[in-house]
Amino acid sequence: MKFAEKLLKHPEFLQLQKRVQEMEQDRIYCHHELSHALDVCRMAWMMYLEDEYKTHLKDYRQKKEAKVEVSEQKYRAEIAGQYITDLQTDDADHTEKPYLNADNMLAKKDQFYVTGLLHDIGRVAQYETGEHHSVAGVRIAEKLLTEIEYPSEWMRETLQIVGVHHGREETDGEFSRMEYYIRRADHLSRNCFFCEASDSCKWKKEERNQTICW
């Protein structure tokens, strides 16, 4: 993950991670240090992969229900064959296809991880100045992303997610797929069922996680 690695080695990113860890040392509620960011990255990516698998499975079942004589073995061979073809075709258009080749998958994973790593990057600014972390986060993230030469075609979506990820409830309007997974992972990564501060937590009882999901 080229850009995630660059971000993890960026001095300002590391400094902010250390600073937020120090500032939240005595905090009884949810923390926002690197371990949480990585939880969000991993959970969001797993959710995405699970849904991709379900999409393939649904497609296969629909073919069977339509009495298309495609055995499971033949179906897998077809997908594998197309996968090999895509790998060998540099200019292939994958945007409308229900599967990802290896290069696309690695690139998407990189984008997921960079976005997850940055989603709470504005916390230090919020603690120090009162500026909301989503607002500060967009400003800081844009600077960091520019300095690691993050792809311009990914920039807008990542900054959008950094700016709105904190909402726990569904809102009007459409989310990008990555935004949907990052928002869910940010919420579901919290172990409310094992939290000693739950009695005074600002989350409503129905919002609290009662078990593990991923």
Task: Explain the meaning of each model-derived region.
Residues 1-214:
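Metal-dependent phosphohydrolase cores
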